[in-house]
UniProtKB/Swiss-Prot annotation:
The keyword Flavoprotein appears for this protein: no
Known EC number: 3.1.-.-
Note: Despite having conserved helicase domains, this subunit does not have helicase activity.
Function: The heterodimer acts as both an ATP-dependent DNA helicase and an ATP-dependent, dual-direction single-stranded exonuclease. Recognizes the chi site generating a DNA molecule suitable for the initiation of homologous recombination. The AddB subunit has 5' -> 3' nuclease activity but not helicase activity.
Binding site for ATP: 8-15
Protein name (Swiss-Prot/TrEMBL): ATP-dependent helicase/deoxyribonuclease subunit B
InterPro entries membership: ADDB_N, DNA_helicase_suAddB, P-loop_NTPase, PDDEXK-like_dom_sf, PDDEXK_AddAB-type
Length: 1149
């Protein structure tokens, strides 16, 4: 027995040396076993290399083993497999259950145990304790000695959890760490490795338990050779040295040999001369030797094999990597399998790599294990319990249904979802028969379908979901043990054909050549079964409720990750830096070389902080290295990664991340620039239009096609193009498969994002020959004809959600104010009679009655909405008080509320005769009409209630965006003209319903507060420019009015702050509005549905438009232009109105 070290820096051929020796031993005819011991993650690669090197080994003496497979071999021979193996899933489940049982004793950790990922951290620290042979008793003893209270409590609780874990495990189970302890014990009785020769390769260091196994192997084996990535042995080195960790490993192995009287053979030194890997690459040899040299050594020659790339963002970084891979394979005779792409943080890149490499046709394998929690099958199972635990919430139900593993098709799910969302269905409502009207909540979405049939359909779908689930929940609640609960869940999944559905999906994925997804799905069912098996194993006979079962099930799934085996021989390997080993790479791409990422500058501390570890070390409790040591070890990781290629090295870094946030280059970049002053540096931050750059953009057919189209677009703008792209165009044109695609794309160059005029006959059928139009619809058409067409022609509607939206708020407020006016009439009161107390009382009564009248009123559906109801009551009470104050201070009195004009209404509709002789009717409802009688003359003002800020602007009237108030006014005046009644306009106003916040620098009286409220809620609109009328409208006016937008000077004339119009100007506005209505109606009926939204400053019709995804309006599209509305002075608008009315003459009938 003896030990031999094989020294060699990166690339010196240590693995090759081991394989060559194994081959020689086989050829010499030696009969003893020849074992290559490597880390678990490298066994596949090592077996491949062994097969390639050995070629013939009929007696199968040469084997590749990891510590795990070594343990299995020994246990098979001498026993040790009788105890049930518990994997990381079972460990996590046991730990969670233990923490539930110990919750009364866990002040520090119990609450944290509910957090996702915390159980994994506890499992990791217990694993660390086991690896470093720290027992629960030692933890408790140390805790008693420690002065720091926080750490003392931590250790006490960890000791309790760890102790209970060990107690449960030793009854009949064994985990991976205990397997190493058992292996060390059983090796003594094993005969199969007696006289064997071991080559241990690929390790940087070992855990204490692995050292114990190695101690036993050293006693058994004829010889143990250990490769060490380092310089030739030195007596001592600093902890900042590149090879410090490897040196520590050497020292520990020497100590074991010394203590056990094991001979030390002459080491093999492979560090002489140029490393084997870099024999033909002077630059890489220099890099390997001087990467971390201090002071810097400079390579003064041209650098051709090492390059840097600065990318504008992560997408372009990966795309450039793909192009360079294509070039290497095409021009440098490399195979895809010669190429490795690596990143320190692969999770940041793997989706992009998958997308872009697939687009470029690059076969690749991503060596990354993925969490399974978002796999549809796992979601189907976890949401099964979530539905019950969250009382049939919308989110949990439809998370379950949308997995694709129910019997519902997408149309049924969508149909059901619309109904559930519109009616706020959750909880116990899923057990009832649904009778909520489709028409009421979904705005007549089912005009062509009988209401009864729709309800029958939605209830059938609902029952198909709820009945089997409720049966499952009932069966589950009757389960007496975890074993029975697992059986019920398993049977439920089998009854729903989940295993068969998975098989069908796998087959479909393979047929579509989606092998990676097929591979993932092929593992999922086994994982589900294994999780249930582990639950039965570790707590099978225990009683458990559904809540705890669900949590433990989630913990079990969290412990699993899905990995893949490379399905092809010739493909690019994409791996993370910390999983890299020599892959005989000829080309290496290091991506994401940014500051703090490569090398990593920080690590999560875990359960025990660095400070905790330092304190424990002082109490002789040795654990794994702290985060500071890990930072020092990063340079070794960087070294091994950068020196793993023999021919070509490209290091790239983006200057911005996925979200556009700036990133700094890694310190490695500046180090490379200093070592290699002649290094080639590329960048796409500024695109260069050179022949070389254009040629570089030619790679695979798909991406090159996109580059060609991009060049053609630039040609259209710059009026020049590189002739290369004309040659590329000819290549595609001569290929049948590409010709049609080219034609389609080139057609798109002339694309105009506009719509054709719809023939009048079709538009009439679409609008169903409607002749009645509301004012709001006309304003909608004026704002954007296309949005109007989509809403009223195509009947497209936003999905109705059970919520209290602004339109609902407006309707509610209008209804309350209307009911208040009815209550006043019933009690024979006038608005002048109201005081603040009565306003509060009457509004409370009205709101209560409205809520009682509708059993399912949304304002009673939750505490949040009940609070909103109280707030609205306060706002409306304030509005009623302000209205009463307005009326008290005015000679104008309300003559009507909710005054309708239309067929069979108080006032007839406004009739407009179009150019073709057709007639349309304008209909509507006026919130309030106030009247002032002056002799035989009557003056009216129109009041429209608004729940938000609304300001009347003349330019909006001119362009048709604000027609409402003037049409309301015209409906009254036109009717009066026909009846020869002398009624004159006094004003048109918006009244804002609000309870404003009043800010004051000092204490103010109630009277001052009321004035401030009135000022904030002043009417907005146009008042008749008649001083007498203004004074009648605000009898208390003194200067600027508190209630109307007007002011009176001291001499009795109208002030400048007055927002008004003369009698002639009101007439002008009426004529203009009628002309505008006629124009809009004719455009509408003539089929104009152009995409022309208005724009006024920063405000556009598109801002809150729900149809932007339909029109795809973009100003860079030909034909897409705004209808600009310029803010102008009043005088300019009046002149424009005058010219427009004079031009049209007697246009309005």
């Amino acid at each position: 027995m003896g030990i031999r070290f094989i020294y060699g820096r990166a690339g010196t051929g240590k693995t090759y040396f081991c394989l060559r020796e194994i081959k020689e031993k086989i050829n010499d005819g030696n009969s003893h076993p020849l074992i290559l011991l490597v880390p678990e993650q490298f066994t596949f690669e090592a077996e491949k290399y062994l097969l390639e090197t050995v070629e013939k080994d009929r007696k199968m003496r040469a084997q590749v083993l990891s510590f795990k497979t070594l343990a299995n071999r020994v246990f098979t021979e001498v026993g040790g497999l009788t105890r049930q193996h518990v994997n990381s899933c079972g460990r996590s489940m046991v730990i969670y259950k233990i923490m539930e049982d110990l919750k009364e004793n866990l002040k520090v950790y119990y609450k944290a145990s509910r957090q996702q990922g915390f159980i994994k951290k506890i499992s990791e620290v217990i694993t660390e304790f086991k690896r470093f042979e720290v027992t629960p008793e030692k933890l408790m003893d140390t805790a008693e000695s420690i002065q720091k209270e926080g750490l003392r409590e931590k250790l006490r609780e960890l000791s309790l959890i760890y102790g209970k874990f060990d107690e449960l495990l030793h009854q009949k189970y064994i985990d991976e760490e205990d397997a190493l302890t058992l292996l060390a014990e059983k090796l003594e009785y094993s005969e199969q490795f007696k006289g064997a020769e071991f080559w241990i390769d690929g390790f940087t260091g070992f855990t204490p338990k692995q050292y114990k196994v190695l101690e036993k192997l050293l006693k058994k084996a004829a010889r143990v050779s250990v490769t060490l990535t380092m310089d030739t042995s030195k007596d001592s080195i600093d902890n900042t040295d590149l090879f410090y960790t490897t040196k520590k490993t050497e020292d520990k192995l020497l100590k074991i040999c010394y203590e056990n009287n094991i001979s030390y053979e002459k080491p093999v030194d492979l560090n002489e001369g140029v490393p084997k890997r870099f024999e033909k690459n002077e630059e890489m040899a220099f890099l390997e030797k001087h990467l971390f040299s201090y002071p810097y050594k400079i390579y003064s020659k041209d650098t051709k094999n090492i390059s840097l790339f600065k990318a504008v963002n992560v997408y372009s970084e990966v795309e450039e990597t793909a192009r360079e891979i294509i070039r290497l394979v095409r021009d440098e005779n490399l195979r895809y399998s010669d190429i490795v792409v690596t990143a320190r943080d692969l999770k940041r890149y793997h989706k992009l790599i998958k997308t872009i490499f697939s687009h470029y046709g690059i076969p690749h394998f991503i060596d990354l294990k993925l969490d399974i929690k978002n796999n549809p099958i796992i979601v189907y199972i976890t949401s099964l319990f979530e539905i019950y635990l969250k009382n049939w919430s919308y989110e949990s139900v439809f998370r379950h249904l949308k997995t694709g593993f129910t019997n519902l098709n997408k149309e049924d799910i969508s149909f059901l979802e619309n109904y559930v969302l519109a009616n706020g269905i959750k909880g116990g409502k899923w057990k009832e028969e649904w009778k909520y009207s489709f028409r009421n909540r979904l705005d007549k979405l089912f005009d062509d379908q009988d209401e009864k049939e729709a309800l029958e359909k939605v209830n059938t779908i609902k029952n198909g979901i709820s009945e089997p689930l409720n049966k499952f929940y009932k069966d589950f609640s009757n389960a007496n043990t975890v074993r029975e609960a697992c059986e019920i869940l398993y049977n439920f999944l089998v009854e729903r054909d989940i295993p068969q559905r998975i098989e069908n999906l796998i087959r479909e994925f393979k047929e579509n050549k989606e092998f990676e997804i097929a591979n993932q799905y092929s593992q999922i069912w086994d994982i589900v079964v294994d999780v249930l098996d582990q639950m039965v194993e570790v707590m099978g006979e225990e009683k458990i409720n559904i809540d705890l079962f669900s949590k433990i099930l989630d913990i079990g799934f969290e412990a699993y990750q899905i990995g893949s085996i490379p399905p092809a021989l010739d493909e690019v390997l994409v791996t993370s830096v910390d999983r890299m080993k020599s892959h005989n790479a000829k080309a290496l791409f290091v991506i994401g070389a940014n500051d703090g990422i490569f090398p990593a500058s920080s690590f999560e501390e875990g359960i025990l902080t660095d400070e905790d570890r330092q304190i424990l070390t002082s109490y002789e409790v040795e654990l794994d290295r702290d985060t500071k040591a890990k930072v020092f070890e990063e340079q070794f990781l960087v070294y091994t990664a950068l020196t793993s290629t023999s021919k070509f090295l490209r290091i790239s870094y983006p200057i911005a991340d996925h979200e556009g946030r700036s990133l700094r280059p890694s310190i490695i970049i500046s180090r490379f620039k200093r070592i290699f002053p002649q290094i080639t540096q590329f960048s796409n931050v500024i695109e260069m239009d050179t022949d070389e750059e254009n040629l570089h953009r030619v790679s695979s057919p798909d991406p090159t096609f996109n580059e060609m189209i991009k060049s053609f677009k630039e040609w259209d703008i710059k009026d020049k193009i590189n002739s290369l792209w004309l040659d590329v165009y000819n290549w595609y044109s001569n290929k049948e498969v590409w010709r049609k695609r080219i034609e389609k794309v080139l057609e798109g160059f002339n694309y105009s994002n506009q719509v054709r005029v719809i023939p009048s006959a079709k538009i009439k059928r679409l609008y169903k020959d409607e002749i009645n139009f509301s004012v709001s619809r006309l304003e909608k058409y004026a704002a954007c004809p296309f949005a109007y067409f989509v809403q009223y022609g195509l009947k497209a509607k936003e999905r109705k959600i059970y919520s209290f939206d602004p339109p609902d708020l407006g309707i509610f407020m209008h209804n309350v104010l209307n009911e208040v006016s009815k209550a006043l009439e019933k009690e024979d009161k006038t608005w002048e009679d109201l005081d603040r107390e009565y306003c509060d009382e009457v509004v409370n009564i009205v709101v209560d009655n409205m809520l009682k009248g509708v059993s399912e009123h949304i304002l009673k559906s939750s505490p949040r909405y009940e609070y909103l109801s109280k707030r609205l009551t306060r706002v409306l009470s304030n509005a009623v008080w302000v209205i009463s104050e307005h009326i008290k201070r005015s000679s104008f009195i309300p003559s009507g509320h909710e005054v309708a004009f239309g067929e069979n209404q108080m006032y007839p509709p406004i009739k407009i005769i179009l150019s073709n002789g057709e007639e349309i009717n304008l209909i509507g409802r006026i919130d309030r009409v106030d009247v002032f009688e002056k002799g035989e003359e009557s003056y009216i003002r129109i009041i429209d209630y608004k729940s938000g800020n609304k300001e009347l602007k003349l330019e909006d009237v001119f362009y048709g965006l604000e027609l409402q108030l003037l049409i309301y006014l015209d409906a009254i005046l036109e009717s009066a003209d026909k009846e020869n009644t002398d009624i004159k306009p006094a004003g048109i106003f918006y009244f804002r319903i609000d309870d404003p916040i009043v800010k004051a620098d000092k204490d103010i009286t109630d009277e001052e507060l009321q004035k401030e409220i009135l000022k904030k809620l002043r009417l907005d609109g146009l008042v008749l420019k008649d001083a007498e009328i203004i004074k009648e409208m605000d009898k208390s006016i003194n200067g600027t009015s508190y209630i109307i937008p007007a002011s009176i000077n001291k001499d009795g004339t109208i002030g400048k702050k007055t927002k008004g119009a003369t009698k002639e100007q009101f007439e002008l506005l009426r004529k203009h509005v009628k002309n505008m209505i006629k124009d809009l109606a004719e455009q509408m009926i003539n089929g104009n549905i152009s995409i022309t939204p208005y724009r006024k400053g920063k405000e556009t019709a598109c801002k809150y438009c729900p149809y932007s995804s339909v029109c795809k309006f973009e100003t860079n599209f030909e034909g897409n232009k705004y209808m600009f509305i310029k803010e102008q002075k009043e005088e300019e608008i009046w002149n424009m109105l005058q010219k427009e009315v004079n031009k049209d003459g007697d246009k309005v009938d």
